[in-house]
From Swiss-Prot:
One of its GO terms (molecular function) is oxidoreductase activity, acting on paired donors, with incorporation or reduction of molecular oxygen. GO terms for biological process: tRNA modification. CDD domains: RHOD_YceA. Pfam families: Rhodanese (PF00581), UPF0176_N (PF17773). The gene is trhO. This is tRNA uridine(34) hydroxylase. Keywords: Oxidoreductase, tRNA processing. Residues 278-326 are annotated as: Disordered.
Length: 326
């Protein structure tokens, strides 16, 4: 059994006081050695974190003690190593950024399709299948016959729809993403634009890979994930990709053989795109990482997680004492 449980989670729900959830959530994560990033916004929670089994269970139990976060959707996979360096809880305007005002998956959303029924849907010639993810994700793998919208960020997806899709022409649309959250927003947007039959893969690609046997699968390639594993194969095991620390894009062993590759500084995808100042900064960072590795330490910058946890627990205790005195 792998040592670390990787948990991707989200829930669209009204969180008027989401700012107040940050400190207790961060303190809990640091106390239980949970790394990764969670996003909080007025529309809900989203993120991916990793810890041992006990740590993840503690987090899920905490979420269930907050009535609005009960029933948070989550999916688990496993990693031999801790795939995150830091623990973060960020406050955002959106938990997944589409950049279009008024899109609310709690009120209108596409039709969910179970992984077991997905093959039949996308094999239908009348169904227009769209991968809502970004170029660098699709390059690694996608479903057979799916259209690549050629977007660099999710914010560009509405423009793709406006320029390339028509409710009168595309009567049936099927969409998918890594874990399901982007499709919550994209299908809600499509419905608002007048598309009537809009479907999306429930649980996303990760759930499909988990539940559909590889011999029956219509998935081709590997699946990009937003953690240190970079990508997973059909068995949800780490695939043969690394991350360029300069541009944060996935790279292969072949990329690392290129004369344009310099560890931590550039790869064939980003060589020549950074300023001299950035390149020097990347080289200095790589030097510090190397020195930290030689000392048997982990270079993540700033104070340690233990120090941050102690400081936050003291801050929460002080606030609790002040409330009792009030």
């Amino acid at each position: 059994m792998s040592q670390y449980v990787v948990c991707a989670l989200y829930k669209f729900v009204e969180l008027n006081n989401y700012q107040e959830l940050r400190e207790p959530l961060l303190a809990l994560m640091e106390k239980h050695h949970i790394r990764g990033t969670l996003l909080l916004a007025g529309e809900g929670i989203n993120g991916t974190v990793a810890s041992d089994r006990a740590g993840i269970d503690t987090l899920l139990e905490w979420l269930n003690t907050e009535p609005r976060l009960t029933g948070t959707v989550y999916k688990e996979s496993y990693s031999e190593t801790q795939p995150f360096n830091r623990t973060k809880v960020k406050l955002k305007k959106e938990i997944v950024t589409l950049g279009v005002e008024g899109i609310d998956p709690r009120h209108v959303v596409g039709t969910y399709v179970k992984p077991q029924d997905w093959n039949d849907l996308i094999a239908d010639p009348e169904v227009f299948v769209v991968d809502t993810r970004n170029d660098y994700e699709i390059e690694i793998g996608t479903f057979k016959g799916a259209v690549n919208p050629n977007t660099e960020t999710f914010r560009e997806f509405p423009d793709y729809v406006k320029e390339n899709m028509d409710p009168a022409k595309h009567k049936k649309v099927a969409m998918f993403c890594t874990g399901g959250i982007r499709c919550e927003k994209s299908t809600a947007y499509m419905k608002e634009q007048g598309f009537e039959e809009v479907y999306h893969l429930e649980g996303g690609i990760l759930k499909y890979l988990e539940e559909v046997p590889q011999e029956e699968s219509m998935w081709e390639g590997d699946c990009y994930v937003f953690d240190g594993r970079v990508a997973v194969n059909h068995q949800l095991e780490k695939a043969d990709y690394d991350l360029c620390n300069a541009c944060r894009l996935p790279i292969t062993d072949e990329d690392k053989q290129s004369e344009l590759f310099e560890q931590g500084v550039s790869c064939p995808k980003c060589h020549g795109k950074h300023s001299e100042e950035q390149v020097e900064r990347f080289r200095e960072r790589e030097k510090q990482v190397s020195l930290a590795n030689q000392r048997g330490e982990q270079h993540v910058g700033g104070e340690s997680a233990k120090q941050r946890a102690q400081r936050r627990e003291a801050k929460l205790a002080k606030k609790a004492a002040q409330r009792k005195q009030a």
